[in-house]
């Protein structure tokens, strides 16, 4: 099941390219990349249970096809294997990075559960969750790549910043997808809205509207009355108030910040590939 839905493998690619950008790919780099991919998949499986998600990339999630118990145990099994792969790098900093990922993801999930359904959520609140739940994954993927290539402190800092900004860009694109009408993006459209999550397009729309419609939308969010009719009402409100355009602009801002972090590295195919990864994060169709 996992192998059939392996996805884009962007995360391990970031580990390998980060190592190559500041040195060379080593056997330890491959172990680090495997660890990061396993950890990423474990986090997705656990997220599906927490968020009651039953579809990903156009197919049933593990908890939908089997049970929540099987999903949790599968995620735990992957997490254990991620730790085993991390030990093969023979690097304490890599092990520390893997441990930090687990902590940041858990913090982010709790933060999201606390803030996601609040109509008064701000862009700052939103970015705090995004940094914890998505950007930190990219941050640590790039750090692990650099660590396995013996990168300097300055190189590591640039790689980590690149990963964080690219991760924010990537998540904003995902949140824009929630307003699409195409199931091919890999999850049901309006999935976040139906779960009551207030993401950047809607946050912008609420904060930049002063008429009675704004109060109506906030009341729906706070009451958690997410019927299909109300979800459509909220989606159309965000679109009409320019929420998608604003989110797209912020996404491009973070993409530019990500690419800017690579300016100190000498020109190489690996560096150009990292730039293309950042461009892909904002331009992708799925």
Language model: regions and residue ranges:
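All-alpha prenyltransferase/terpene-synthase fold signal
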Residues: 1-286
């Amino acid at each position: 099941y996992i192998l059939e839905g392996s996805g884009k493998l962007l995360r391990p690619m970031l580990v390998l390219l980060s190592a190559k950008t500041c040195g060379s790919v080593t056997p330890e780099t491959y172990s680090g990349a495997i660890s990061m991919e396993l950890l990423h998949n474990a986090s997705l499986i656990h997220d599906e249970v927490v968020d009651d998600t039953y579809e990903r990339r156009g197919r049933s999630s593990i908890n939908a096809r089997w049970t929540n118990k099987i999903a949790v145990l599968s995620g735990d099994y992957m997490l254990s294997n991620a730790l085993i792969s991390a030990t093969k790098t023979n690097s304490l900093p890599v092990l520390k990075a893997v441990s930090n990922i687990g902590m940041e993801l858990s913090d982010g999930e709790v933060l999201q559960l606390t803030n996601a359904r609040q109509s008064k959520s701000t862009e700052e609140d939103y970015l705090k969750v995004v940094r914890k739940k998505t950007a930190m994954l990219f941050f640590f993927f790039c750090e692990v790549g650099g660590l396995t290539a013996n990168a300097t402190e300055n190189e590591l800092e640039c790689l980590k910043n690149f990963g964080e900004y690219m991760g924010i860009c990537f998540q904003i694109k995902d949140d824009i997808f929630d307003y699409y009408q195409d199931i091919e993006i890999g999850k049901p459209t309006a999935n976040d809205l139906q779960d009551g999550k207030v993401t950047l397009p809607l946050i912008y729309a609420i904060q930049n509207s002063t008429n009675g419609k704004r109060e109506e939308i906030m009341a729906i969010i706070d009451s958690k009355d997410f019927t299909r009719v109300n979800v459509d009402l909220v989606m159309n409100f965000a679109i009409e108030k320019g929420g998608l355009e604003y989110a797209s602009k912020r996404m491009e801002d973070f993409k530019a910040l990500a690419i800017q972090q690579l300016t100190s590295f000498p020109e190489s195919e690996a560096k150009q590939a990292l730039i293309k990864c950042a461009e892909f994060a904002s331009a992708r169709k799925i």
